[in-house]
């Protein structure tokens, strides 16, 4: 695409006609029209990056949408698999066994989606690869799940929603944060070094074996591990080594810095190979699907979007959301009724005032991830 040419973003709404095509069929038509068929997938491994939802949360994308994408990829001769990487925090997705069980319980199985499910950074979240970030200002090498990078073709399938830290969770967050290994997520979230929660430490020393820098010291008297701040480099390897959630990083990176790091991680994932992106603005909960609960949607179901440009796709989804009326009774509507919230045209700031969400899009454009200028093509 030339610098003067706008990125193309394709759109269709969620309306259907009685006894006509269902939403999975509409999604198939959308991605075909958007040009997914131009990617050579014959005999190639195709990663479909999505979020399977935390246990207790039911606002994540239904497996039916994943199945629709899988069907199209198979028609094109590809070998698809669904993937996500483990979380840096305790929950139902912190290791591959629990992550898969969570995915199955939430409806994602080979039977329902038509392809295997592979956790991208392995059993403990330590199976990653260092990927250079071209033009990165904050990240020189991104720690990406190995299975994600081993794929020949990369597809993202995103549930576009609000987010308590980044303002919104779109394509860039799905890719950048989602494809980071446990250490990679730590790399983005934390500005410091870990600490050991002594009550949970069993003194097994697994974490110490993973540390290449002498950053962990075992106290023989207490039989507990401690962080040596002088030697710890904050790489996050110890996080995946602990089976007892005794090692923790503070989520203390400033929101603007977090947003910029996510954009750079996204660039590491998509650079140099075929990629295509899908985003569904549906069940727009105020918080991330990483929560074990979900609140009522802050915005109506707006539609399905697809593009080869991840930045243009996020921008189009943002613009659609900002133009929509808030849902009555939602967190956003309650905030708008508060006289302390003055910018009635910025739903994401009004929902999460400290998010600095615009910094993600601006930095993504600066580093060449894509374009914020787009042509919206409605089906």
Residue ranges and their predicted role:
Residues 2-50, 55-57, 61-65, 72, ...:
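Extended, low-polarity segments enriched in aliphatic/aromatic residues
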């Amino acid at each position: 695409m030339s610098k003067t040419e706008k990125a193309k973003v394709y759109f269709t709404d969620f309306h259907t006609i009685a006894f006509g095509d269902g939403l999975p069929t509409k999604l198939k038509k959308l991605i075909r029209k958007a040009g997914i068929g131009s990617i050579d997938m014959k005999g190639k491994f195709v990663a479909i990056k999505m979020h399977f939802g935390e246990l207790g949360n039911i606002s994540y994308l239904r497996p039916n949408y994943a199945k629709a994408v899988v069907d199209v990829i198979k028609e094109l001769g590809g070998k698809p698999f669904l993937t996500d990487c483990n979380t840096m925090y305790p929950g139902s997705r912190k290791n591959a066994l629990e992550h898969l069980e969570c995915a199955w319980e939430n409806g994602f199985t080979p039977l329902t989606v038509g392809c295997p499910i592979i956790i991208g950074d392995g059993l403990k979240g330590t199976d990653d690869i260092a990927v250079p970030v071209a033009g990165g200002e904050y990240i020189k090498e991104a720690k990406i799940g190995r299975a994600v990078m081993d794929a020949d073709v990369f597809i993202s399938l995103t549930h576009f929603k609000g987010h308590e830290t980044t303002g919104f969770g779109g394509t860039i967050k799905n890719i950048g944060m989602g494809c980071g290994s446990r250490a990679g997520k730590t790399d983005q979230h934390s500005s410091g070094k870990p600490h050991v929660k002594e009550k949970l430490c069993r003194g097994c020393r697994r974490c110490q074996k993973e540390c290449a820098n002498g950053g962990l010291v075992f106290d023989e008297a207490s039989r507990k591990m401690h962080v040596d701040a002088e030697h710890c480099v904050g790489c996050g390897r110890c996080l995946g080594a602990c089976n007892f959630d005794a090692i923790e990083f503070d989520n203390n990176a400033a929101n603007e810095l977090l947003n910029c790091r996510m954009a750079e991680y996204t660039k590491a994932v998509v650079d140099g190979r075929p990629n295509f992106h899908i985003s569904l603005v549906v069940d727009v909960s105020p918080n991330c699907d990483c929560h074990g609960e979900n609140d009522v949607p802050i915005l109506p179901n707006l539609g399905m979007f697809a593009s080869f440009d991840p930045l243009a796709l996020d921008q189009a989804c943002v613009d659609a959301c900002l133009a929509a009326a808030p849902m009555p009774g939602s967190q956003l509507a309650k905030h708008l009724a508060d006289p302390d919230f003055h910018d009635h045209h910025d739903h994401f700031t009004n929902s999460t005032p400290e998010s600095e969400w615009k910094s993600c899009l601006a930095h993504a454009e600066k580093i060449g991830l894509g374009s914020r200028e787009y042509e919206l093509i409605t089906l």
